[in-house]
């Protein structure tokens, strides 16, 4: 990344306004898009694995399929659900990541 240059502009009222020069840097845009893509994937995994876990539990309670393989499926989808939830929780704790990518 290049150096950030701050340009000062004097307004009619005499106040000085500053503006950073590299606001539309390609690296910052790509970095922000990568972070958004990770969040979208984690959210999709959270929803899909949660739905699969619920459906597996319903099938297990109804007795529609053998218990062994279905119990493993429930355990793996629950683990994946918790992993995606952790990713989203960590991202939620760092709410300033969007603001840090665009410092205009």
UniProtKB/Swiss-Prot annotation:
Transmembrane stretches in the record are: 39-59, 70-90
Q: Which GO terms describe its cellular component?
A: extracellular region; host cell membrane; pathogen-containing vacuole membrane
Q: List where in the cell it is found.
A: Secreted; Host vacuole, Host pathogen-containing vacuole, Host pathogen-containing vacuole membrane
Transport keyword on record: no
InterPro entries reported for this sequence: IncF (IPR035119)
Q: Which keywords does UniProt give here?
A: Host membrane, Membrane, Secreted, Transmembrane, Transmembrane helix, Virulence
Task: Assign the protein's first listed, main location to one coarse class.
Answer: secreted
Membrane topology classification: Multi-pass membrane protein
Q: Does the keyword Secreted apply?
A: yes
What does this gene product do?
A: Inclusion membrane protein probably involved in early modification events of the chlamydial inclusion.
Query: What name has this protein been given in UniProt?
Result: Inclusion membrane protein F
Gene name linked to the record: incF
């Amino acid at each position: 990344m290049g150096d950030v240059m701050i340009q000062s502009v004097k307004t009619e009222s005499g106040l000085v306004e500053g503006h950073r020069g590299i606001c539309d840097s390609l690296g910052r845009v790509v970095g922000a898009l990568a972070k958004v893509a990770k969040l979208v994937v984690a959210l999709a995994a959270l929803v899909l694995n949660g739905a699969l876990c619920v459906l597996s539990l319903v099938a297990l309670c109804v007795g529609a399929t053998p218990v062994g393989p279905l119990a493993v499926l429930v355990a793996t989808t629950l683990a994946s659900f918790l992993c995606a939830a952790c990713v989203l929780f960590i991202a939620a704790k760092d709410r300033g990541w969007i603001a840090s990518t665009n410092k205009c």
